[in-house]
């Protein structure tokens, strides 16, 4: 009888530890980071896109290419990924970085940090020209569109490569 009780206590203890571990993982989970990279003819920074029509205006203004690559969804088009349904749930933060044929560039979004009310998003990104290739001529902007929470009203961009 006593061994049955001790077995039950061990099982209850193991289940409790598993439940606590799951709760801690959920509490400490960071929001999913999704961003898009595309080429453009012109640059702009710090813009918060809140609707499909605003995105369409930006595409016309700076010439963002229709084909995009996301860090989660491989290849798509702007209109497929960022439709009216998307803007019901999220907003887009925009950062554009200048590139040319003279260097090999590294660019990525590292993390998005929100304040407690989720109205301010700090976007840590990496951008640096890495290896000098010795050519110059073709220039463009690489536009990174970062998906942020719909409550965001203020953006801060921090280049991790300059820290």
Map each language-model feature to its residues.
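Exposed, flexible binding/inhibitory loops of compact, secreted disulfide-stabilized domains
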Residues: 5-163
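Juxtamembrane low-complexity tails/linkers enriched in Ser/Thr-Pro and polybasic
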Residues: 1-3
């Amino acid at each position: 009888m006593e061994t049955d009780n001790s077995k039950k206590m061990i099982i209850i203890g193991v289940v409790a530890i598993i439940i606590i571990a799951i709760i801690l993982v959920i509490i400490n989970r960071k929001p999913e980071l999704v961003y898009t990279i595309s080429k453009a003819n012109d640059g702009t920074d710090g813009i918060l896109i809140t609707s499909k029509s605003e995105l369409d205006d930006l595409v016309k203004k700076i010439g963002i290419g229709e084909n995009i690559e996301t860090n989660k969804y491989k290849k798509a088009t702007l209109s497929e990924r960022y439709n009216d349904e998307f803007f019901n749930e999220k907003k887009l933060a925009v950062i554009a970085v200048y590139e040319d044929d003279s260097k090999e560039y590294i660019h990525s979004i590292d993390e998005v940090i929100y304040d407690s009310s989720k109205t301010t998003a700090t976007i840590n990104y990496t951008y640096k020209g890495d290896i000098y290739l010795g050519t110059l001529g073709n220039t463009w902007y690489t536009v990174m569109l970062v998906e942020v929470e719909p409550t965001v009203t203020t953006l801060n961009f921090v280049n991790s490569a300059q820290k």
